[in-house]
Amino acid sequence: MNRLNLITLGTKNIVKAHQFFKELGFDTSIRGTESNPVIIFFKNQGTKIALYPLEELAKDVNNDNPPAIANGFSGITLAYNAKSMEEVDEVLKKAEAAGAVIQKEPEKTDWGGYGGYFTDLDGYYWEVAYGEDWEFDESNMLIIKDE
């Protein structure tokens, strides 16, 4: 098992979450209707993202004994890898305008890059970062090189 195909984000309000991500520029495909979606898939390159109602996602994990829905930092961050420091700034401003909360203003990082963090409407942490030496493949996915 050496790939990750889909990340599903449980959301408290799928309609509001959908609007938020549309404002960030994501193209989506809705199963159901716009006012009552069942699931929403992002039509992004690379690993796909989906939005699904949080309580329904917990039941999907275990219908008889769904996991508790927690608040706070889950130990997971999602990342958008930018191609310039200016793009980092632009993405963070766009996220904030769409309703995100900036958790860390963009700054030079201890690993030599530049980045910041925001939380989306459901509290998921998103890193927006840039590295001078980063290279991207034809799908705009970061190339991870062996050292």
Task: Identify the residue ranges that each predicted region occupies.
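Vicinal oxygen chelate
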Residues: 3-12, 40-41, 64-147
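Short secondary-structure boundary/hinge segments and terminal tails
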Residues: 38-40, 60, 113-114, 141
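N-terminal beta-strand motif that seeds the catalytic metal site of vicinal oxygen chelate
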Residues: 1-19, 30, 75-80, 132-147
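Core segments of cupin and vicinal oxygen chelate
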Residues: 8-58
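A short, acidic/glycine-rich surface segment
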Residues: 35, 58-65, 135-138
